[in-house]
Amino acid sequence: MWAIYSYIMIKKKIKIWQIILSILLGLISFSNFAQQEAQFTQYMYATQIFNPAYSGNRGIMSLKFLGRSQWLDIEGSPKTSILAFDTPIGKSENMGLGLSVFNDQIGPVNETNFSIDYAYSIRFMFSKLTFGLKAGVNSMDISFSKLNIYDNTDPYINYVIDNKFQPQVGVGIFFNSEKYYLGLSAPNLLEKRFFELAESSSSFFSRVSDNIHFYLIGGYVFDLIPSLKFKPATLVKAVRGSPIQWDLSLNFLLNNNFTFGIANRLDSAITGLAGIQVSDALMIGLSYDFTTTEIEDYSSGSFEVFIRIDFGTNRKILTPRFF
């Protein structure tokens, strides 16, 4: 009986990896990928934002905050704030629920996103496969009058986009054990068209839209010695119109309490990361990006803070602090 059971489980795992590989190959077929969504360095702790399948994955109710100031010293540079909540639900806790509020400010643009996530897990002996759905709404405000205008006769200087709403529908898949994880997601499958201007007399037409973003995340936890773990992680982001963005982080976890490491955003930034598990319920993480592009002549870098509060920490949970 054990041999039959083992054979069935192996067949299931092979099929799962075939599904994941097929989806990944599908993404690779996209070419000419532009960054339009906000970026953040501590993605391994805020996976729920771009992958709904992560909601409830840690088996505990959590409240998370992430704040980022990008390209310090540059007026109008991106500023991002995220508040997210997730919890397992159901008698067997094979489902997850998540809520998040996301705000991104870049110059005259202020975008806010409200979303709800639902996740469903299929458990195996030492791992689980989770599918997630995301639904929400985006609100965008744009005030061109905030720009430094050289041509005051431009009729569109005073054009204001106020609370332009767009629906959001996203999907994700997340496969993990206690030691490794792999996730693939598209947090919004709908193209967001924020405004269209047309002037027949001058044949002027302009449209601002947001393309579909794809995220691939993965990581592993190595036990170097009983008190030290090595946690490499990577995030690949692709969007039509720009080169693929690749983040790689190398973190260490000391005594299950202190996190430190470095990260690299390919051809963009080198980052230092540090974090502390203040208590069973509270974790604080910090990161500082040193820009490696031409922007470094005008900016002193980018700063990010992450705070996570867990509720019900007396329960036994899967991978409590590793990812």
Where are these regions (language model features)?
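Short, basic, low-complexity termini and linkers enriched in Ser/Thr/Gly/Pro
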Residues: 24-27
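Bacterial N-terminal signal peptides that target proteins for export
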Residues: 10-20
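Intrinsically disordered, low-complexity regions enriched for glutamine and histidine
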Residues: 16, 33-34
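Cytosolic nucleotide-binding catalytic cores of signal-transduction proteins
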Residues: 7
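Subset of outer-membrane beta-barrel
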Residues: 35-323
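N-terminal signal peptide c-region/cleavage motif recognized by signal peptidases
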Residues: 29-31
